[in-house]
Amino acid sequence: MKFLFIVQGEGRGHFTQAITLEEMLLRNGHEVVEVLVGKSSTRTLPGFFNRSIHAPVKRFISPNFLPTADNKRANLTKSFAYNLLKLPEYIRSMYYINQRIRETGAEVVINFYELLTGLTYALFRPSVPYICVGHQYLFLHHDFEFPDKNSCQLWMLRFFTRMTALKSSKKLALSFREMEQDDNNQIVTVPPLIRQEVTAIRPEEGNYIHGYMVNSGFADSVEHFHARHPEVPL
């Protein structure tokens, strides 16, 4: 079968998932005809993605979250105003996505959490089915429980996630924990998409904890902690 990937260009996770899924599809005799990647003024394509992906890559203007002053989280008010001003560009991007779905001859579209994919299917109704992939779709699973946090922010997170999956045929929620299929929300939990290079690495014991920070502002917090606790290796 012929697949078209549409990838949200923010962060590294969606890129590695796309690379891994392409490898799996190619091994099983399928074809990825093209990869569309959302871009903005703050996003650049990482080198490992260009080196690893085999299908042609094309880019389109996509919504972007603007950070707070401390660069630890998204500034929702600022992001909403910014993206509202960019709405004409996003409409052109949706026309472009719809065009690429038709012209590539794709039989299935795979969406890696890109908002404009859901909006394109809601507005243009392409005949090609599409499947959403990402751990974020666990947020919509009927058995998933959020911690006691800001209910408004959690509602907005779920709302955004639903918008990325409008008119989708299925949502593949990446999860280390097995959960039953949620037929009402068309959600199937599957294991995380991990690259072969990672699984081939030989683990070694070390006196450290490896962490991942979504926003660079958290690095200041780590450095401040280390300054107060120099006995903890950094």
Positions of PLM-derived features:
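Active-site donor-nucleotide binding/catalytic segment of nucleotide-sugar enzymes
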Residues: L174-E178, Q186-L234
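Active-site-proximal region of nucleotide-activated glycan assembly enzymes
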Residues: F124, V128-T189
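A short, Lys/Arg-enriched amphipathic alpha-helix followed by its capping loop at the start of a domain
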Residues: L21-H30, H224-H229
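Conserved nucleotide-sugar donor-binding subdomain of glycosyltransferases
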Residues: N71-V108, L115-L116
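A short, glycine/small-residue-rich beta-strand->loop->alpha-helix junction that serves as a flexible
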Residues: V7-I19
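An aromatic- and histidine-rich active-site surface loop
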Residues: T44, V109-F124
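Extreme N-terminal starter segment of soluble prokaryotic enzymes
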Residues: M1-L4
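Conserved nucleotide-sugar phosphate-binding/catalytic loop shared by glycosyltransferases and other
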Residues: G9, R27-K86
